Each structure stands twice: as structure tokens, then as C-alpha cells.
Amino acid sequence: DYSVTPALAAGDPVKVSDTKYEITLRDGAKFSDGTDVKAADVVSSYERTTDEKSIYRQFFTFVDSVEAKDDNTITIKLKHPFANLKERFVNVRVVPASMDEDSLKAKPIGTGPYKYENITATEVTAVPNEYYNGNEPAKAPTLKWQSLKDDSARLAAAIGGTVDIMEAVPASAQDQLKGAGWNVESKPGYGN
């Protein structure tokens, strides 16, 4: 349903004032390499996300600062009140502050229920993260993402049954997919 629920956080952001929030990390949160997740990692990840080269920077213009209050608490100060704080912060992919960009591209480390097992130019494979202690553990033994950039290749894979989920469905293909038994959903983006 595309609703946002806490994953790495212990709960929703706590409103301190109209322009200040605090987020507490989940007890015992670890990265997929087994190291502890700290508030400094979240701050560093926010800084990566809002770097001038990042496509996600545009989604955080309402933020004044993000700081580590202590090892488990992040303080977010806003330039003005903003109702969709938690929905925007899902764009911050939390990674170890100590990792450089090349290491993250070669073997990404995260905090979710899955960890990367294999990455190629056309496919990504993920398996359950044994260090994950959140509310939504991995349910499938393996997840695979294929990079099918061509609309006709994605459509053929969907109708042929070699994929279970498809993003960016061409409007002209919706009826064909529905006719093949697919459930086609349309969800608004940030600008809608």
C-alpha cells in the first residue's frame, strides 16, 4: 500500500517542535556485515543523499540540519514545518559512515531484511540478512532484480512469466498485462 513504517527507527519521528524532530534507532540494529548502526552513520548517509551530485537532494530542501544527538538518536531541524518528513526520509539509504563510494558500489552494505549476494550489470541477487532484527524479516530465500531497460523486453518477460513484478509499465501495455492476469496499479509520485 506504499505506506511508510519504521524499519531502522524504533518508531516514527518524535515532534519536539514544529521544526525539530528526533528519531531513535531500533535497539540492536546492525548492518548486513554485522557491525552496529550508529546515529553518525545515519547523519553521514543523509549527507551522501543530499550531496550536490545526488538526484535525491531536491527532496530535502526543507531540512536545515541533521545531527547525531548520541549514538542512537538523530535530531532533524527543519527550515519550516513539513508534514511528510518520514515519507521523504525513506530516500536516505543508511550505510556505514566508514565506507567509500567505490566500496559501496562493489558490495553495498545496508540495514534491511536482505543483503546483496551478487551484483552484475544486468542482475542483482539478494538473500536474507542474518543480522536483521526488525519487524519485517525476509520471507523469500532469494530475490532477483533484472535490469530490463527496453519496454518490449520488460513486457515480454512479464507476459512470459519470468518476472513477478514490473515497474514503469508503459500506458499502452496496461490492457495487455491485465489480459495476461497481471494486477496493474498506478501510484502518485512526489509531484502528484
Placement of each model-derived feature along the sequence:
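Solvent-exposed coil/turn segments that connect beta secondary-structure elements
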Residues: 17-19, 26-28, 42, 47, ...
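N-terminal lobe/hinge region of extracytoplasmic solute-binding protein
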Residues: 1-16, 25, 47, 109
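Gly/Pro-rich hinge or "lid" segments in bacterial periplasmic/extracellular proteins
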Residues: 3, 89-138, 142
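Sec-exported extracytoplasmic/periplasmic mature domains
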Residues: 27-30, 47-54, 94, 150, ...
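Ligand-site clamp/hinge motif
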Residues: 102, 131-176
